[in-house]
């Protein structure tokens, strides 16, 4: 694939092409993400790697000063489509593509992340081509413990990285925003992004 050509095309008529990168196309792409896997560039942090997150992050193929913005999701509430588990990686990739095409962020400065903790979507979990963990989602306590490790290790490796939480369940979106907002350079797009746009209008 040719990343330069992709962004050249998208930016040649941004308003016309945005729907190809994000809503509505990204929703269908996420639903079928495991079935049309094309080696996307994104970081999967699996709950089965708890205790080894630092090593997983170190495998990201960029210099330690390169990533400037990350979009992180657990795939639990993708758009209006519900729990898509690991397939939620597509939403992180799509959102960062908007930042590249619309805001001039360099592609090498982006970091799409999916926190794979399983899925409660049984149909997806049982699909023979599904690439995520085939287990139900953990308790909130176990999830918080894992995400705490992720945030700590991401910040230690990339202290200037802005971390955007995207499409988490409402319960966990508010929980993590309250937990991390004064500790790390992070925000929740679904809560703060929407509110900011309304206030700006």
What residue ranges belong to the model's regions?
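Metallocofactor- and cofactor-centric catalytic cores in central/energy metabolism, strongly enriched
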Residues: 1-201
């Amino acid at each position: 694939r040719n990343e330069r050509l992709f962004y050249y095309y998208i930016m040649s008529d941004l308003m016309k092409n945005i729907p190809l990168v994000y809503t509505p196309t990204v929703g269908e792409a996420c639903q079928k993400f495991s079935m049309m896997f094309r080696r996307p560039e994104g970081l999967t942090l699996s709950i089965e790697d708890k205790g080894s997150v630092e090593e997983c992050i170190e495998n990201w193929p960029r210099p330690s000063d390169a990533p400037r913005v990350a979009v992180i999701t657990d795939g639990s509430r993708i758009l209006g489509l519900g729990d898509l588990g690991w397939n939620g990686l597509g939403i992180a990739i799509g959102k960062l593509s908007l930042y590249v095409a619309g805001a001039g962020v360099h592609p090498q400065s982006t970091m799409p992340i999916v926190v794979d903790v399983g899925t409660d979507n049984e149909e997806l979990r049982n699909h023979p081509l599904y690439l995520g963990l085939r287990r139900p989602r953990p308790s909130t306590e176990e999830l918080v413990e894992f995400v705490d490790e992720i945030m700590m290790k991401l910040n230690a490796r990339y202290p200037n990285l802005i971390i955007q939480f995207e499409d988490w369940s409402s319960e966990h979106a508010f929980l993590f925003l309250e937990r991390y907002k004064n500790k790390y350079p992070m925000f929740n797009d679904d809560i703060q992004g929407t509110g900011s746009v309304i206030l700006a209008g």
